[in-house]
Amino acid sequence: MDTQAFRRSLHHSDRYNRRGFDSPTKRAQALEEAYQSDLITSIRNNSFTYKKGRLNIKLAQAFGFCWGVERAVAMAYETRRHYPDENIWITNEIIHNPSVNDHLRKMNVKFISAKNGIKDFSLVSDGDVVILPAFGATVQEMKLLHEKGCHIIDTTCPWVSKVWHTVEKHKKHTFTSIIHGKFKHEETLATSSFADKYLVVLNLEEANYVSEYILGRGNKNHFLNKFAQAFSNGFDPDKDLDRVGVANQTTMLKSETEEIGKVFEKTMLHKFGPEKLNSHFLAFNTICDATEERQDAMFSLVDEDLDILVVIGGYNSSNTTHLQEIAINKNISSFHIDTPERISVKENSILHKPLKSEMVLKKNFIPDGEIKVGITSGASTPDKIVADVIEKLIAITK
């Protein structure tokens, strides 16, 4: 399928909208009313610090809603106002934030159901309005919705679209796309649908494994079993890893994406020599600015003398879990929560989710005496949620 030609055709359809309905000023005002916090604004204006009694708060200097998320959420709300009586569907969570998605449900936006990873579009009819979330949608989903005669509201983050352009470039020049991401993540599913041959690698360990295979040090059956579900149909590692380009899920750890790019550049340099490198490796630049800023701010935050650190964001939010990884790697006692309700003021407890683990209840999580708490949040977390967490910490330390 010529995905570029399809996208061009879709963009010229009178049933496709990727700009929204409100002016930038009205959009900003609506978001400010819904999600901004005077407390957070005050803390930002005070060098990201706050003190109340024995509680000392240090906020990361970049956290919370990014531009792409703000745009997607605003467009989703605008869509209901613009189509007050129509059936409105969304193909997935608009962003990985439970409060925002719950608000859409209260606005009678229906979420496409899925079973075993297969979405059921049977209830979507001609003339219905369908929102594509910030992560994007697969090209097959877009084609299906277009053929059904739906009004498509595309809130895909422009940084995600940039990655799609990258893998389409790989396809045009017959390169296999190596995508740094989680193969079941909505964004990676969308990105891979625009590729021809692709392989998804989760981390540096998997990238090094692929590198060894390219250099002739691996077993094909083991390779195929290890990456089952993470490569394109008909993928043959003996043929499809001679020419590779790297792309990424925009919310992955920036430093690891860069390392993975270096791994494959060095691998192709070793196998084919400098004179043929450009024929076998395509450089990339698909790291999202907002992801980079939040991770850099987190690296600065963990250098502070913190007693504990609270990371706020959806449990299925990739960018949030990577922020937590940074804290863990610095051996800081950190707690990942998705909503302020995970904190009990009465019990001085926090119900949190450690990495790759089930929920854990930590009692007496705020110790006696002076305490310095670091706080950050993922790109899908509104300021009001962060403020509500801080208010609970204030109440505990009174």
Swiss-Prot record:
Which amino acid positions bind [4Fe-4S] cluster, per UniProt? 66, 157, 288
Catalytic site positions: 187 (proton donor)
Q: Which UniProt keywords apply?
A: 4Fe-4S, Iron, Iron-sulfur, Isoprene biosynthesis, Metal-binding, Oxidoreductase
A Pfam family matched in the record: LYTB
User: Catalytic activity annotated for this protein?
Assistant: isopentenyl diphosphate + 2 oxidized [2Fe-2S]-[ferredoxin] + H2O = (2E)-4-hydroxy-3-methylbut-2-enyl diphosphate + 2 reduced [2Fe-2S]-[ferredoxin] + 2 H(+); dimethylallyl diphosphate + 2 oxidized [2Fe-2S]-[ferredoxin] + H2O = (2E)-4-hydroxy-3-methylbut-2-enyl diphosphate + 2 reduced [2Fe-2S]-[ferredoxin] + 2 H(+)
InterPro entries membership: LytB/IspH (IPR003451)
- Record-listed E.C. numbers: 1.17.7.4
Copy out the cofactor comment: Binds 1 [4Fe-4S] cluster per subunit.
Q: In which pathway does it act?
A: Isoprenoid biosynthesis; dimethylallyl diphosphate biosynthesis; dimethylallyl diphosphate from (2E)-4-hydroxy-3-methylbutenyl diphosphate: step 1/1; Isoprenoid biosynthesis; isopentenyl diphosphate biosynthesis via DXP pathway; isopentenyl diphosphate from 1-deoxy-D-xylulose 5-phosphate: step 6/6
Residues where isopentenyl diphosphate binds: 96, 185, 317-319, 380
EC class of the enzyme, as a word: oxidoreductase
Q: Which residues bind (2E)-4-hydroxy-3-methylbut-2-enyl diphosphate?
A: 96, 185, 250, 317-319, 380
Q: Which domain of life is it from?
A: Bacteria
- Answer whether the UniProt record assigns the keyword Repeat to this protein: no
One biological-process term from Gene Ontology? isopentenyl diphosphate biosynthetic process, methylerythritol 4-phosphate pathway
* Amino acids binding dimethylallyl diphosphate: 96, 185, 317-319, 380
Which GO molecular-function terms appear in the entry? 4 iron, 4 sulfur cluster binding; 4-hydroxy-3-methylbut-2-enyl diphosphate reductase activity; metal ion binding
Gene3D superfamilies hit by this protein = 3.40.50.11270, 4-hydroxy-3-methylbut-2-enyl diphosphate reductase, catalytic domain (3.40.1010.20)
Needed cofactors: [4Fe-4S] cluster
**Is-annotated flag, keyword Oxidoreductase?**
yes
Family, per the entry?
Answer: Belongs to the IspH family.
What the protein does comes down to: Catalyzes the conversion of 1-hydroxy-2-methyl-2-(E)-butenyl 4-diphosphate (HMBPP) into a mixture of isopentenyl diphosphate (IPP) and dimethylallyl diphosphate (DMAPP). Acts in the terminal step of the DOXP/MEP pathway for isoprenoid precursor biosynthesis.
HAMAP family cross-referenced by the UniProt entry:
IspH (MF_00191)
User: Which NCBIfam families has this protein been placed in?
Assistant: ispH_lytB (TIGR00216), PRK13371.1 (NF009911)
Question: Which protein is depicted?
Answer: 4-hydroxy-3-methylbut-2-enyl diphosphate reductase
Report the source organism: Prochlorococcus marinus subsp. pastoris (strain CCMP1986 / NIES-2087 / MED4)
Q: Which gene encodes it?
A: ispH
